[in-house]
Amino acid sequence: KYFIDQRGQAPLYFEEEGKKYNKPSYWAENKWLNNRYYQADVPVREQEFAEGHAVRAVYLYSGMASVARETGDVTLLKACDRIWKDIAERQMYITGGIGSCDVGESFSYDYDLPNDTAYNETCAAIGLMFFARRMLEIRADSSYSDAMERALYNGVISGMSQDGKRFFYVNPLEVDPEACEKSSIHFHVEPVRQKWFACAC
């Protein structure tokens, strides 16, 4: 509960780190690495929509839902409801994939759901299932179980080969092998499952 309550409150860790070393945080060098990216721009109870790094976001939202359920925190549950509605209605592919933007592996803006450059990280599908499960434990609503099923079959199971030795990090809806090789906007897409990734979740 402490970490949920502290998220988005001053002082922010990365800002304090910058003061300590008398320079901007390493993480502040890129424009998109801001407090919204870390889901820390406002206290969690004030968050209106899914934002930032998709995997970290749904892990945070899972924690928020668990704390809301255990403590009866109505304000926190309302934030979870708003965020869930945003994901389910404006940020999710028909496959259950989330996190459409390859820059920062993140949520983008409403209805930005491209097929060929979709990120839809396998780990985000797993995190979405965690969030949906926790929401389903609070209230029986088929939107949660439907999202779990879509994410499981289209983003989790598909992310690993049957022998468990090769993986998809991203799950776009359209793959052109030539584009993966020659177009910089497709460099994050692999046409076949890979043995290993530089950053494995």
Write out the residue ranges for each language-model feature.
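Glycan-recognition and catalytic cores of secretory/periplasmic carbohydrate-active enzymes
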Residues: 1-201
